[in-house]
Amino acid sequence: AGKVSQEIIDAIDAAGLGKNLEVLGYVSHDEALKLQRQAALLLLIEIDAPITKGIIAGKLFEYLAAARPILAVGPADGDVQDIIEQTKAGAYFSYGSIEAIKTFILNSFESFNLSDYLSKNNLEIEKYHRRNLTERLATIIKN
């Protein structure tokens, strides 16, 4: 869902994958969250620049709440990578890790189980719930 550039659509078509692509355009936030919970795999792509290592997109927290596996791509050794590895919520790859990404996708679909993929990591993921993050921030401010 959302805006997809024509360049990306053309690249998907050129790779012979156009028949697997459904461009939904913009949807409501509630609909986006529903789609996330229904997904077999969630894709999070960060800008490939060292400056983004310390930037955590809000989408990551929505993805964690969706309890679906996350395939993230971005610069190595950043905060997003740390969170994904700590929560075991998926896998993080640097740009150019094509074979490793392919293997992760294939393994994810082979072991796909909508009901319990991330349930075993729920405690780690719960640390990043908005309520818990707000509580931690309030404690920091008070002290």
Protein language model features and the residues they cover:
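Short acidic alpha-helix that forms the nucleotide-activated donor recognition element
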Residues: 28-39, 65
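Acidic donor-binding loop of glycosyltransferase active sites
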Residues: 20, 36-53
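A charged, aromatic-enriched C-terminal amphipathic alpha-helix characteristic of glycosyltransferases
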Residues: 96-100, 113-142
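Nucleotide-activated donor-binding/catalytic signature segment of Leloir-type glycosyltransferases, i.e.
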Residues: 2, 6-33
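Short hydrophobic beta-strand element within catalytic cores of glycosyltransferases
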Residues: 41-44, 62-74
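Short alpha-helical segment that forms part of, or immediately flanks, the ligand-binding pocket
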Residues: 33, 58-66, 81-82
